[in-house]
Amino acid sequence: MSNVPHKSSLPEGIRPGTVLRIRGLVPPNASRFHVNLLCGEEQGSDAALHFNPRLDTSEVVFNSKEQGSWGREERGPGVPFQRGQPFEVLIIASDDGFKAVVGDAQYHHFRHRLPLARVRLVEVGGDVQLDSVRIF
């Protein structure tokens, strides 16, 4: 098990067709966790994608952050995560957005608000036990 926060540098960035696969376990007492695709390694970097399962409020929020300001929140349908259960999330970059796949089902399509080419870091944190973070 990896510990969180987990950070993976992406010096080459990501491009359409890149797949990020996150496998882990939602702890029994989990409140929320996040996956961020950040545009830099420094604190406060812009976020091209903020994927935030919130078990405490039964929602999954998608957002972006630019120049310190969060954008408009989008929500996926229902919460495909359960406390005490393992999960697999695929985040697939395309020309027009990020497709989130949870388990075997497409979950939400988040349209790009920042250029995909700016992404330099994957960060996973919060209430989650990570098994692996892979980039294909």
Curated annotation (Swiss-Prot):
| Cell location | Cytoplasm; Nucleus; Secreted
Keywords for this protein? Apoptosis, Cytoplasm, Lectin, Nucleus, Secreted
Write out the tissue specificity statement of the associated record.
Mainly expressed in stratified squamous epithelium.
| Key word Nucleus present | yes
Residue ranges of domain Galectin in the record: 6-136
Write out the transmembrane intervals.
Answer: none
What biological-process terms (Gene Ontology) are attached? apoptotic process; heterophilic cell-cell adhesion via plasma membrane cell adhesion molecules
Q: What induces it?
A: By p53/TP53.
PROSITE patterns found in the cross-reference section = GALECTIN (PS51304)
- Keyword field contains Aminoacyl-tRNA synthetase: no
Q: Name one GO molecular function term.
A: carbohydrate binding
Disulfide feature: none
- GO CC terms: cytoplasm; extracellular exosome; extracellular space; nucleus
Q: Which domain of life is it from?
A: Eukaryota
Residues annotated for a beta-D-galactoside binding in this entry: W70, G71, R72, E73, E74, R75, G76
The record, for Pfam families, names: Gal-bind_lectin
Among PANTHER family, the record links this protein to:
GALECTIN (PTHR11346), GALECTIN-7 (PTHR11346:SF107)
Q: What does this protein do?
A: Could be involved in cell-cell and/or cell-matrix interactions necessary for normal growth control. Pro-apoptotic protein that functions intracellularly upstream of JNK activation and cytochrome c release.
| Oligomer status and interactors | Monomer.
Annotated protein name in UniProt: Galectin-7
Supply the source organism for this entry: Homo sapiens (Human)
What does UniProt list as this organism's lineage? Eukaryota, Metazoa, Chordata, Craniata, Vertebrata
